[in-house]
């Protein structure tokens, strides 16, 4: 691959990163789809990182805020999705600190109240099981779910 082609791919990736936060895994996947050689992908990723176009800490923080506030995901689901994107555990932990335990419980409570209104089950045990499964699928822990369900009774 010549220098001109490298600059073309670099420019495309810079434009992509300028539109929204991206992580190394996102850019790598995009470049691999276009059959860019691995050594060139590594060079492009390093260049983007050194120029501040990609930053794992910034990406993880934005991802946590978006998924928590907009989609109501819990910390477990957010952490798992960030791990899929190969974000280091220490970066994930630091990003998850941005959402406090109180706001996690409040969001879970709001989600469970909404869900409880749509659950038609009259048996309290089955109703509680449905709400628990729902909250687990959203990425909350058993302890958080138990705590909130206890408040709601």
Residue ranges of model-derived segments:
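An alpha-helical, amphipathic repeat domain used for nucleic-acid recognition
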Residues: 1-153
């Amino acid at each position: 691959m010549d220098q001109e082609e490298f600059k073309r791919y670099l420019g495309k990736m810079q434009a992509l990163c300028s539109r929204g936060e991206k992580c190394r895994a996102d850019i790598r996947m995009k470049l691999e789809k276009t059959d860019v050689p691995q050594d060139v992908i590594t060079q492009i990723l390093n260049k983007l990182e050194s120029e501040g176009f990609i930053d794992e800490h910034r990406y993880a923080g934005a991802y946590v805020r978006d998924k928590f506030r907009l989609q109501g995901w819990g910390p477990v689901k957010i952490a798992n999705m960030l791990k899929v994107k190969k974000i280091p555990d220490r970066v994930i932990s630091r990003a998850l600190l941005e959402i406090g335990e109180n706001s996690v419980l409040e969001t879970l409570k709001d989600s469970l109240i909404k869900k409880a209104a749509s659950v038609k089950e009259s048996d309290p045990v089955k109703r509680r099981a449905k709400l628990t499964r729902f909250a687990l699928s959203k990425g909350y822990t058993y302890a958080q779910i138990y705590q909130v369900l206890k408040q709601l009774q």
